[in-house]
């Protein structure tokens, strides 16, 4: 069902299906929601930390983008409206409250499903045989391949050539893997999915709501913005992770 071509402007049926399949999958593998990171302990504090963390690094990325455009004399203004993300950039422009709610709820569904499956279920299943780092590698490689559905859909719709499909797929596999690996580290460090979920939610939501208008168009430097935010976030997280690992002498 192509809900991305309807009033909703977003594909969410498969994400709802993924959430529904998560429950029997947990039962099949002898796991429960708490074991994969959905416990109630630290829920508010880790969600708050994730929201602050994600917002901080995107704020820095926006500032860098704005400074760059100002130096070139190309900045027009910032704008706030709901758009949909595609592999070729943000599309659509909706300013109604209903569309804002759809955006927020849709991103929440997406975050619950992806974190529950890739950083929760798959991570725990792989950890039965491999170390944390190897398990994170495999689960987030799958997360990367999951994101090739976007360019594949564009290819089927005739919006992208076969070459474009392969190039965009490779880029998405790599970037999604690195971002997912970051969320896996957050889950390992906090013992729950909530910080990663909150950062994931900020990542998906902010690019759909806060837009940079320049003389060249809307969100012309979107890829740069995302790259800067994720790179800074990942580097800072790695510093905390290595410091924590040394202090606890953990074998991961």
Model-derived segments and spans:
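Transmembrane alpha-helix/helix-exit interface in multi-pass inner-membrane proteins
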Residues: 62-71, 136-156
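C-terminal membrane module of polytopic membrane proteins
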Residues: 201-252
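Aromatic-anchored segments of alpha-helical transmembrane domains
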Residues: 1, 55-62, 141-149, 201-211
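Residue-level signature of the transmembrane alpha-helical core
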Residues: 12, 16, 47, 51, ...
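Membrane-interface helix/loop boundary segments of multi-pass membrane proteins
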Residues: 113-142, 188-192
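Short juxtamembrane and helix-loop transition motifs at transmembrane-helix boundaries
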Residues: 62, 97-102, 154-164, 191
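Membrane-interface interhelical connector segments
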Residues: 79-87, 117, 151-165
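Alpha-helical transmembrane segments in multi-pass membrane proteins
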Residues: 1-30, 38-40, 45-55, 76-102, ...
